[in-house]
From Swiss-Prot:
Transmembrane segments: 6-26, 43-63, 80-100, 166-186, 195-215, 242-262, 277-297, 390-410, 432-452, 466-486, 505-525, 555-575
Organism: Homo sapiens (Human)
Cross-referenced SUPFAM superfamilies: SNF-like (SSF161070)
Disulphide bonds in the chain: none
Tissues where this protein is expressed: Kidney and small intestine. Expressed in the S3 segment of the proximal tubule. Expressed in neurons.
Protein name: Sodium- and chloride-dependent transporter XTRP3
Location (main, coarse): membrane
GO-annotated molecular function: amino acid transmembrane transporter activity; amino-acid betaine transmembrane transporter activity; L-isoleucine transmembrane transporter activity; L-proline transmembrane transporter activity; neutral L-amino acid transmembrane transporter activity; proline:sodium symporter activity; solute:sodium symporter activity
Length: 592
């Protein structure tokens, strides 16, 4: 007798699982960057439009497919058509790539969390040099937060070619991160369903606490004004619309197979349309809410740096030209500098290299995303707060909850097709399959803890999923609407939920959403082609800054392999099915 499929304890567990998976680090470190780059408040216009015409329809489609077929990604697409099993395989491959490197972020968060209990915070000051006559040269040229990230955390090599060895402290943190993930997925929906209550809700508690603290910081209003002041001209920028569509697409986690896996554990009568709307709205609200928190903190950091710059320049000019204490202010500094340059040209030119141009606007314009925002900009702001240890613990605990929540979805996308397979599940219990997946990912993930690990992390982060996911979701929409049949799919949903599918969803699925995906695919493909030689940012310890370098030939080969290994699953699986059927038909033909 076939074993009954496990179910979520209730629909709330399912919603929390989807929120925990979809709401991730991208909401905290990419959306604020896009707001900063594309006109602050005006970026919300293309973002909300793309949410309505792309995000909600595609999320509803994946949830409906999972709930209707009641299988993981491979089984679900094979049921729709035997020629489409490669779509599910491609999703599993992409999720496997993501799991390989994504948990390294959780390892870094653990590393920073453990160091957050020190007083003072280890990234708040530069260490002394070897003979204790001054500060470390690399740290002085960079900053204490950059030094802690690049040297103490990553111990980064000067280039991708110099791999170095595995760093044992980050490696232990990665081992811990995978152990936590394994314990969370050990019993399938039974254990995951309980964990997601925490991973989905606790980040909001921390964000609310941070919002209250952020709004009380000196200079927070400067950051919020910068965010909410719209630059209307950006609405005419095609890249603003492209990036809005991209952010919606990737922040919801479409194409990985995780949403299909989660929905497959629903009751058939579950209202997946309502849940798709709820999850997508909460995801977008979180991005905007996190941006308010980020820009209040960012405003504090920018104001702190700006006022520090003013103090240093004022002190330098006061001491050099014997000015009266307190004479120089923010309002007259530029005017006095101009006067001193004309009145004492030789003296002023000698000290000119030490005189910085202090500008609050330029501080706010400095755009940072990804790990730079999470582990450098935020820590720069935290170190200047009162009771900095508390704020550091809260922040990195929040990052962990977001990261672990996303990892639960990533691993579900891999595990569900494996446990659905009768061949595998008949020989291995669920706990063993989960353990093997975690062990393999952890072992491969050790590459990212090497001295060149951060460069490999960037390669996987930039190229493992982008084009592959666009192609996967494009094939998904075409498969449902034109292979399985939109009318047939519509009648299935009505039979399951008792509700008719509105014309809006059908128009989006059959026309608008696929056209948007094709547009994104063409944009990214042309962008890669026009870019020419692919480059990466390498850390130069002698300068204390990042420098641009060309990827070596073997790295380009890895990038090509990452893209091809997932996308080629779709045509190869279809070809394999075709050949298999032809052979069977040939065997069935009578001998003449």
């Amino acid at each position: 007798m076939e074993k009954a499929r496990p179910l979520w304890a209730n629909s709330l567990q399912f919603v929390f699982a989807c929120i925990s998976y979809a709401v991730g680090l991208g909401n905290v470190w990419r959306f604020p960057y896009l707001c900063q780059m594309y006109g602050g408040g005006s970026f919300l216009v293309p973002y909300i439009i793309m949410l309505i015409v792309e995000g909600m329809p595609l999320l509803y489609l994946e949830l409906a497919v999972g709930q209707r077929m009641r299988q993981g990604s491979i089984g679900a697409w094979r049921t729709i058509s035997p020629y489409l099993s490669g779509v599910g395989v491609a999703s599993v491959v992409v999720s496997f790539f993501l799991s390989m490197y994504y948990n390294v972020i959780n390892a870094w968060a653990f590393w920073y969390l453990f160091h957050s209990f020190q007083d003072p915070l280890p990234w708040s000051v530069c260490p002394l040099n070897g003979n204790h006559t001054g500060y470390d040269e690399e740290c002085e040229k960079a900053s204490s937060t950059q030094y802690f990230w690049y040297r103490k955390t990553l111990n980064i090599s000067p280039s991708l070619q110099e791999n170095g060895g595995v760093q044992w402290e980050p490696a232990l943190c990665l081992l811990l991160a995978w152990l936590v993930v394994y314990l969370c997925i050990l019993r399938g929906t039974e254990s995951t369903g309980k964990v997601v209550y925490f991973t989905a809700s606790l980040p909001y508690c921390v964000l609310i606490i941070y919002l209250i603290r952020g709004l009380t910081l000196h200079g927070a209003t400067n950051g919020l004004m910068y965010m909410f002041t719209p630059k209307i001209e950006q609405l005419a920028n095609p890249k603003a619309w492209i990036n809005a569509a991209t952010q919606i697409f990737f922040s919801l986690g479409l194409g990985f197979g995780s949403l299909i896996a989660f929905a497959s554990y629903n009751e058939p009568s579950n209202n997946c349309q309502k849940h798709a709307i709820i999850v997508s709205l909460i995801n977008s609200f979180t991005s905007i809410f996190a941006s308010i928190v980020t820009f209040s903190i960012y405003g504090f950091k920018a104001t702190f740096n700006y006022e520090n710059c003013l103090k240093k320049v004022s002190l330098l000019l006061t001491n050099t030209f014997d000015l009266e204490d307190g004479f120089l202010t923010a309002s007259n500094l530029e005017q006095v500098k101009g006067y001193l340059a004309s009145a004492y040209p030789s003296k002023y030119s000698e000290m000119f290299p030490q005189i910085k141009n202090c500008s609050l606007e330029s501080e706010l314009d400095t755009a940072v995303q990804g790990t730079g925002l999470a582990f450098i900009v935020y820590t720069e702001a935290i170190k200047n707060m009162e009771v900095s240890q508390l704020w550091s613990v809260l922040y990195f605990f929040m990052l962990l909850m977001l990261g672990i929540g996303s990892m639960l979805g990533n691993t579900a996308a891999i595990l569900t097709p494996l446990t659905d397979s009768k061949i595998i599940s008949s020989h291995l219990p669920k706990e063993a399959i989960s353990g093997l997946v975690c062990l393999v990912n952890c072992a491969i993930g050790m590459v990212f803890t090497m001295e060149a690990g951060n460069y490999w992390f960037d390669i996987f982060n930039d190229y493992a999923a982008t084009l592959s996911l666009l192609l996967i979701v494009l094939v998904e929409t075409i498969a449902v609407c034109y292979v399985y049949g939109l009318r047939r799919f519509e009648s299935d949903l009505k039979a399951m939920t008792g509700r008719a599918v509105s014309w809006y969803w059908k128009v989006m699925w059959a026309g608008v959403s696929p056209l948007l995906i094709v547009s994104l695919f063409v944009f990214y493909l042309s962008d890669y082609i026009l870019t020419g030689t692919l480059k990466y940012q390498a850390w130069d310890a002698s300068q204390g800054q990042l420098v641009t370098k060309d990827y070596p030939a073997y790295a380009l080969a890895v990038i090509g392999l990452l893209v091809a290994s997932s996308t080629m699953c779709i045509p190869l699986a279809a070809l394999g099915t075709f050949v298999q059927r032809r052979l069977k038909r040939g065997d069935a033909d009578p001998v003449a």
